[in-house]
Amino acid sequence: MTTLRLLISDSYDPWFNLAVEECIFRQMPATQRVLFLWRNADTVVIGRAQNPWKECNTRRMEEDNVRLARRSSGGGAVFHDLGNTCFTFMAGKPEYDKTISTHIVLAALNSLGVMADASGRNDLVVKTPDGDRKVSGSAYRETKDRGFHHGTLLLNADLSRLANYLNPDKKKLAAKGITSVRSRVANLTELLPGITHEQVCQAVTEAFFAHYGERVDAEVISPNKTPDLPNFAETFARQSSWEWNFGQAPAFSHLLDEHFTWGGVELHFDVEKGVITRAQVFTDSLNPAPLEALAGRLQGCQYRADVLEQACESLIAEFPAQKGELRELAAWMAQAVR
């Protein structure tokens, strides 16, 4: 009986793919060695301990319909599009060894004619006249009896978009999260014009089989049919939830300030697990009462644009004379935290 398992996802949904990964990892026998191949459409994937408001340009992501996905491993933020091929290697302990999976990926690249080396913070790089260029980044997760190594290979990623979404707005965040290390990157198409996702998957698969001396048929995982994986529906619901993707952010503080025709406003927020634990409002407005009331309304709210906007709008009935000011304030707050 083979100890290998090969899974290939035909979904581009990051929440679906990460839920599949999590379910397989939790329920796999300790004797099994798994390779999961997948890719995501337009997504910023952040590490388990990262703050999305600090790492990402969340406003531009929303405007461009780019999803946010928090993974269960550590490390930094990355942008995925269909120009990336994602891989996950899983194994039980004591056999789990990230150097083995790194060797497999390097062997796959070598078979395609790309000589790469492992470097620094879990990267694979190629040497160019301009210096080392990163073609792959990885992250890892271990539990008591198993571990996984997952990462991406840059095939034909839109590197300009990567810079757009991973360069955060200059918000005044005093955050305790982990800031990603920006690296010089290169696409494999610069080295192998015309290389495809399917060719890379085939190369990684063959290197996986060669290392273990076994072969196995691929299992195609599709969202058109709910995967036969224990607790998949619950895992997908969690992976796609605001509470997981945003609410798991480390505690941080945010200062917003703006000058309106009717006065200046300064908002101070303390946020924990995506919820405002303290809100202070300062203003030189001649009618400060609605803003003073707003501070109380905001405490306990989720740090979401729509929620903050609703909290501000809810004061209109109480302060109808300041309707215009409150609507202006609501629109500004919603835009500022996106």
UniProtKB/Swiss-Prot annotation:
Q: Which Pfam families match?
A: Lip_prot_lig_C, LplA-B_cat
Tell me if Oxidoreductase is a UniProt keyword of this record.
no
- What EC class is this? ligase
Pathway assigned to this chain's UniProt record: Protein modification; protein lipoylation via exogenous pathway; protein N(6)-(lipoyl)lysine from lipoate: step 1/2; Protein modification; protein lipoylation via exogenous pathway; protein N(6)-(lipoyl)lysine from lipoate: step 2/2
CDD domains to which the protein is assigned, alphabetical: LplA
The listed locations are: Cytoplasm
Q: What else is known?
A: In the transfer reaction, the free carboxyl group of lipoic acid is attached via an amide linkage to the epsilon-amino group of a specific lysine residue of lipoyl domains of lipoate-dependent enzymes.
Q: Which HAMAP family match?
A: LplA
> Under what name is this protein listed?
Lipoate-protein ligase A
User: Where is the organism placed in the taxonomic lineage, from the top?
Assistant: Bacteria, Pseudomonadati, Pseudomonadota, Gammaproteobacteria, Enterobacterales
Which gene is transcribed and translated to give this protein?
lplA
